Amino acid sequence: MTRKFEHIGAPEARSFIVERLSDDALLGRKGFTMRQSTYVLPYPPSQRSYARDLVAAVCADDLPNRGVRAAQVNLYDIVLDYLDSQGMWEPLCEAEQAATRDELIMMLQDTISVTSVIKPAVERLIGEAECDIAFITGVGETFPYVRTHTLLGEIDTDTPIVLVFPG
């Protein structure tokens, strides 16, 4: 299912993505068994806003028009919600002023566990959405303290996942 496009916002990119992601075999429908459950939608970092708009339109309009329930799960939102709920957001912002980049990354890696924080939140959000396919976004915003390869290796869901990332 590999195809490269010059621009993620191109109409042909959108139609290709919708066509592929609404396929019954990919979704495990009508007696088909999914061959794989994780897909990657890379885009150039300079096209971030186009990728965000594309995923929003595909999830809100294109896939539902084909009978596919899609959900977006934003890793950055999960991280911010967790830090805020634990009362860690303000102290982290204060520490950012004095810490080096590497120290800040270490603080975040020690605080935001993929296994105990991110994974359960992603699985919960996918389950609550009762979706046929889930788009994981916010990957660039959480790199390098959230490693998506670790997350994908640990997620336990039958829902196909599309990892949307700058790269």
Region locations from a protein language model:
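N-terminal, charge-rich interaction modules
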Residues: 8-90
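Structural motif
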Residues: 40, 133-135
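Gly/Ser/Thr-rich loops at beta-strand to alpha-helix junctions
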Residues: 43-50, 137-145
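Long, charge-dense
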Residues: 70-117
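Short beta-alpha junction loops
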Residues: 76-78, 140, 165-167
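A short, acidic, amphipathic alpha-helical segment used as a generic capping/interface helix at domain edges
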Residues: 116-128
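Short Gly/Thr/Asp-enriched flexible loops that form oxyanion-binding sites at enzyme active sites
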Residues: 144-155
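Short, flexible loop segments at boundaries between secondary-structure elements
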Residues: 156-167
